[in-house]
Amino acid sequence: MNNAIAQQIAEQGGVEAYLHAQQHKSLLRFLTCGSVDDGKSTLIGRLLHDTRQIYEDQLSTLHTDSKRLGTQGDKLDLALLVDGLQAEREQGITIDVAYRYFSTEKRKFIIADTPGHEQYTRNMATGASTCDVAILLIDVRKGVLDQTRLHSFISTLLGIRHLVVAVNKMDLVAFDEQIFQGIRQDYLRFAEQLPVDLDITFVPLSALEGDNVAALGKAMPWYNGPTLLDVLETVEVINLNEQQPARFPVQYVNRPNLDFRGYAGTVAAGVLRVGQAVKVLPSGVTSTISRIVTFDGDLTEAWAGEAVTLVLKDEVDISRGDLLVDAGETLTEVQNAQVDVVWMTEQPLVAGQSFDIKIAGKKTRARVDNIQYQVDINTLTQRVADSLPLNGIGLVELAFDEPMILDKYADNPTTGGMIFIDRLSNVTVGAGMVRQPLQDVYREPGAYGEFELALNALVRRHFPHWGARDLLGGK
């Protein structure tokens, strides 16, 4: 047990009171990003150190490792707290996304330390996909670089609206205010070109020395703003998913015995309640929620982000990949969509290629009909392109093999986000965010021709192993 936790337990009167308080603290997910050697891992190590989140054995090991592998002379190399891979320690860089957890009296945090090297940009995008805030580090000696712009754009593309620009290594320029202000103006000029409105906070700091990280440093009397930790503890993040219409992608059909059939998954948006009428898509069948089951007991309602198992009143044909929505909501099935793509493999993306696509629990296939443009990261302008290279970002049009229920990524990242999977190697090669669903192919149940209904009945009767659904919504 570290000293900070021990002190909180003592102050709150025991372990149970401490755990109860932890459950009711808000959770903030943030990532550190930016160019290589800007000090991302050192900053996280400093946060953990100054908030007393390091255990005694970890601190002892850190002293030993700093002498053997450290790059800071006689000082503790705090980056070693985060860089756990042998290759990371040997090269002094971050390769994989490293997650760390800590808490203060005001909030709980999950940190994603992401790599700055261009070849690991895909790892950075992975880390950003679940975060609320991005800490963008800038080396005060180098200013705004290409990777700074790239990581800023990817963060906004993935829905992050709060950026903290941490101008690091101020100790190496004698804490010069003019240099800091120059970088601030350069970044603001760049940010004006980003496609969304952002909440941007600038903090000058020294991760190595600790100035303005968890406490204000005396070396910068000209700075009268908050520390980095103050920003993280007070930033207001609104869970927009709770305000959206209900979405429940089915991940797994839970059938432990003949007396129980439940549909497991995470509520992607909105709220679901016992007694609520829901519609199953794509079949269109309706039923009512009879139970909301969790490991800790039944709930009366489940909000966005909660993992639950739903039990319905009726025996309904539901499988992995189906979507449960409110019964009164009319959704449109589409077979084409405009999708923002971050390409993650050395083999370029070209029009005409087909991929396996995974959206929430559903796996399907899609073809890239065309690449509408590629984004020039330096200028954020659009340019004509017939392919997307590794780390390329662009807008493509996808044609799915079957009608799909899609939301815009900005409205719902779960039902509007996807990954591209190579059909031969089964490797994830890209990430996609639905910009705009296209081509209405929706038909109300019953709006089928006589021939279609007869063919559907024939297939279901003689070829049940094909898994065809009843177009009339029956079993």
Curated annotation (Swiss-Prot):
<comment type="subunit">
    <text>Heterodimer composed of CysD, the smaller subunit, and CysN.</text>
</comment>
<keyword id="KW-0808">Transferase</keyword>
<feature type="region of interest" description="G1">
    <location>
        <begin position="34"/>
        <end position="41"/>
    </location>
</feature>
<feature type="region of interest" description="G2">
    <location>
        <begin position="92"/>
        <end position="96"/>
    </location>
</feature>
<feature type="region of interest" description="G5">
    <location>
        <begin position="206"/>
        <end position="208"/>
    </location>
</feature>
<feature type="region of interest" description="G3">
    <location>
        <begin position="113"/>
        <end position="116"/>
    </location>
</feature>
<dbReference type="InterPro" id="IPR004161">
    <property type="entry name" value="EFTu-like_2"/>
</dbReference>
<protein>
    <recommendedName>
        <fullName>Sulfate adenylyltransferase subunit 1</fullName>
        <ecNumber>2.7.7.4</ecNumber>
    </recommendedName>
</protein>
<dbReference type="GO" id="GO:0070814">
    <property type="term" value="P:hydrogen sulfide biosynthetic process"/>
</dbReference>
<dbReference type="GO" id="GO:0000103">
    <property type="term" value="P:sulfate assimilation"/>
</dbReference>
<comment type="pathway">
    <text>Sulfur metabolism; hydrogen sulfide biosynthesis; sulfite from sulfate: step 1/3.</text>
</comment>
<dbReference type="InterPro" id="IPR050100">
    <property type="entry name" value="TRAFAC_GTPase_members"/>
</dbReference>
<dbReference type="InterPro" id="IPR041757">
    <property type="entry name" value="CysN_GTP-bd"/>
</dbReference>
<comment type="function">
    <text>With CysD forms the ATP sulfurylase (ATPS) that catalyzes the adenylation of sulfate producing adenosine 5'-phosphosulfate (APS) and diphosphate, the first enzymatic step in sulfur assimilation pathway. APS synthesis involves the formation of a high-energy phosphoric-sulfuric acid anhydride bond driven by GTP hydrolysis by CysN coupled to ATP hydrolysis by CysD.</text>
</comment>
<dbReference type="InterPro" id="IPR011779">
    <property type="entry name" value="SO4_adenylTrfase_lsu"/>
</dbReference>
<dbReference type="InterPro" id="IPR005225">
    <property type="entry name" value="Small_GTP-bd"/>
</dbReference>
<dbReference type="Pfam" id="PF00009">
    <property type="entry name" value="GTP_EFTU"/>
</dbReference>
<dbReference type="InterPro" id="IPR027417">
    <property type="entry name" value="P-loop_NTPase"/>
</dbReference>
<keyword id="KW-0547">Nucleotide-binding</keyword>
<dbReference type="GO" id="GO:0005524">
    <property type="term" value="F:ATP binding"/>
</dbReference>
<dbReference type="GO" id="GO:0097216">
    <property type="term" value="F:guanosine tetraphosphate binding"/>
</dbReference>
<dbReference type="InterPro" id="IPR009000">
    <property type="entry name" value="Transl_B-barrel_sf"/>
</dbReference>
<comment type="similarity">
    <text>Belongs to the TRAFAC class translation factor GTPase superfamily. Classic translation factor GTPase family. CysN/NodQ subfamily.</text>
</comment>
<dbReference type="InterPro" id="IPR044138">
    <property type="entry name" value="CysN_II"/>
</dbReference>
<dbReference type="GO" id="GO:0003924">
    <property type="term" value="F:GTPase activity"/>
</dbReference>
<feature type="region of interest" description="G4">
    <location>
        <begin position="168"/>
        <end position="171"/>
    </location>
</feature>
<keyword id="KW-0067">ATP-binding</keyword>
<dbReference type="Pfam" id="PF22594">
    <property type="entry name" value="GTP-eEF1A_C"/>
</dbReference>
<keyword id="KW-0548">Nucleotidyltransferase</keyword>
<feature type="binding site">
    <location>
        <begin position="34"/>
        <end position="41"/>
    </location>
    <ligand>
        <name>GTP</name>
    </ligand>
</feature>
<dbReference type="InterPro" id="IPR031157">
    <property type="entry name" value="G_TR_CS"/>
</dbReference>
<dbReference type="InterPro" id="IPR000795">
    <property type="entry name" value="T_Tr_GTP-bd_dom"/>
</dbReference>
<feature type="binding site">
    <location>
        <begin position="113"/>
        <end position="117"/>
    </location>
    <ligand>
        <name>GTP</name>
    </ligand>
</feature>
<keyword id="KW-0342">GTP-binding</keyword>
<feature type="binding site">
    <location>
        <begin position="168"/>
        <end position="171"/>
    </location>
    <ligand>
        <name>GTP</name>
    </ligand>
</feature>
<dbReference type="InterPro" id="IPR044139">
    <property type="entry name" value="CysN_NoDQ_III"/>
</dbReference>
<dbReference type="InterPro" id="IPR054696">
    <property type="entry name" value="GTP-eEF1A_C"/>
</dbReference>
<dbReference type="GO" id="GO:0004781">
    <property type="term" value="F:sulfate adenylyltransferase (ATP) activity"/>
</dbReference>
<dbReference type="InterPro" id="IPR009001">
    <property type="entry name" value="Transl_elong_EF1A/Init_IF2_C"/>
</dbReference>
<dbReference type="Pfam" id="PF03144">
    <property type="entry name" value="GTP_EFTU_D2"/>
</dbReference>
<feature type="domain" description="tr-type G">
    <location>
        <begin position="25"/>
        <end position="240"/>
    </location>
</feature>
<dbReference type="GO" id="GO:0005525">
    <property type="term" value="F:GTP binding"/>
</dbReference>
